[in-house]
Amino acid sequence: MATPHINAVEGAFAETVLFPGDPLRAKYIAETFLENVEQVTDVRNMLGFTGTYKGKRISVMGSGMGIPSCSIYATELIKDYGVKNLIRVGTCGAISTDVKVRDVIIGMGACTDSQVNRLRFKGQDFAAIANYELMNAVIESAKVKGTKIRVGNVFSADLFYTPDPQMFDVMEKMGVLGVEMEAAGLYGVAHEFGARALCVVTVSDHIRTGEKTTSEERQTTFNDMIVMTLDAAITL
């Protein structure tokens, strides 16, 4: 039952999919944290895997960069493969001065400069929010592990190289915690097709201060976030 962008067989994906942007990061998650791993799709080298974590079946697949790519894969996973829970895991740039590099942000809502949710909502503004049950599961997992998290709005940008740095002042004033490129689209797709979605990201760099994590710090923080998210996923 291959789709135009996924060549997995029926039943290849678990109900819960971790959804990093980078397909090689998906491979890393599968090989590092899952057992009994099987690669289930590789169209356009957008790799997807299914395995088990602490006995529960879990999948992980790359989404690509940006809302259009993420929305394509999310739609096909939900509509054609019966995926119920999509959890974006990745990195972001911090906006707020009280957010630090290596912090973990849970995107309770996603602002955006994209028009995609207006298109699906007949020209009106749609509140792109995370699913409460998924968000609560990750928050509880963070409490158990003692992981410091921030919960609030992220901004899903269409442009990586923004021509309007003054927009950062507006974002900070409005309490936006970090900038990434997918969550608003993912949340819109999930709402449209009756699935559940969440965005969990680590702060790899600070847009206002210029501070950045080293590659070693980035990997350690990312690993901690993945374990926290997987421990939440097995409770769903």
Swiss-Prot record:
Paired cysteines (S-S): none
One GO cellular component term: cytosol
Residues at the active site: D205 (proton donor)
Residues that, per the record, bind a purine D-ribonucleoside: H5, E180, M181, E182, S204, D205
CDD domains documented for this protein: PNP_EcPNPI-like
Sorted UniProt keywords: Glycosyltransferase, Transferase
Pfam families for the chain: PNP_UDP_1 (PF01048)
Binding residues annotated for phosphate, in chain numbering: G21, R25, R44, R88, V89, G90, T91
Catalytic activity field: a purine D-ribonucleoside + phosphate = a purine nucleobase + alpha-D-ribose 1-phosphate; a purine 2'-deoxy-D-ribonucleoside + phosphate = a purine nucleobase + 2-deoxy-alpha-D-ribose 1-phosphate
UniProt similarity note: Belongs to the PNP/UDP phosphorylase family.
Function: Catalyzes the reversible phosphorolytic breakdown of the N-glycosidic bond in the beta-(deoxy)ribonucleoside molecules, with the formation of the corresponding free purine bases and pentose-1-phosphate.
Protein name: Purine nucleoside phosphorylase DeoD-type 2
GN (gene name): deoD2
